[in-house]
Amino acid sequence: MALSTQMNEQFYDSMADYYHLIFEDWDASMRRQGAAIAKLLPPPEEVGLILDVACGIGTQSLALAAIGYSVEGSDISAVEIARAQREAASRRLKCSFRVDDMRTLKTASVGRYGAIIAMDNALPHLDSDEDILSTFAAMRSSLLPGGKVLVSVRDYARHLQERHTCMPPVFYSDNGQRRIVFQVWDWIDERRYVVHLYVTQETVDGWTVHHFAGKYRAVTPEEIARFANQAGLQEVCVLPSSNTGFYQPIIVAEAA
């Protein structure tokens, strides 16, 4: 396992119990994200089975299942997969989850899915152009003819120019107790950085700080779109947030 892959697996393993805390209201965010993604997909009875290849604790998978889509989810983090399974059970949603690597999708059948998604800036965890191309090739192989790909990524153009070293903190309140979420970026080279994510919670006994570290490679939405084209996907375009209502730009593509 490559060092960056191992680091990111540990990043998400350690975050599994806390991931929902980066949202003001995780359930409300799930509903918004699910509605935005559904606008880019055919209705459930037409699209068939959807595969979420970076499902994490289930944010998008559960949201789509809740509005009638048939969804499978996979992720490199076994700990997050376990939580996604618990969340699906607690919500009585029929949504299956398993461990897999988006670069190979070894557990995904060829030509099985009507759509494949990878949201929340998942692809920039991949450490090379070859890894991104492999991911799109695995997606294409797993799609039905005409199947859709949706990938959301951070709009890195401004960050690459200005070399930001932190993101502004966001402040939430949980029944009167405060919560602060912020990021520090340690740049390794002109593209790669280690993100330090801090979740600071106020409790009756004081403040508790949770720290998680992962690695990203800043790849712009336009670059991601070119990789999708190179991998043989068609009708590739980048949709800005203003067009979709999703919080990140979305790259949309189709299998031949």
What is each model feature region?
Residues 2-56:
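Conserved class I S-adenosyl-L-methionine
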Residues 107-115:
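A short acidic, Gly/Pro-enriched loop at the edge of an enzyme's catalytic core
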Residues 114-130:
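A short SAM/SAH-binding and catalytic strip from SAM-dependent methyltransferases
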Residues 133-145:
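A short glycine-rich, Lys/Arg-flanked "PGG" loop and its adjoining helix->strand segment in the class I
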Residues 217-256:
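C-terminal lobe and adjacent flexible extensions of AdoMet/dcAdoMet transferase-like proteins
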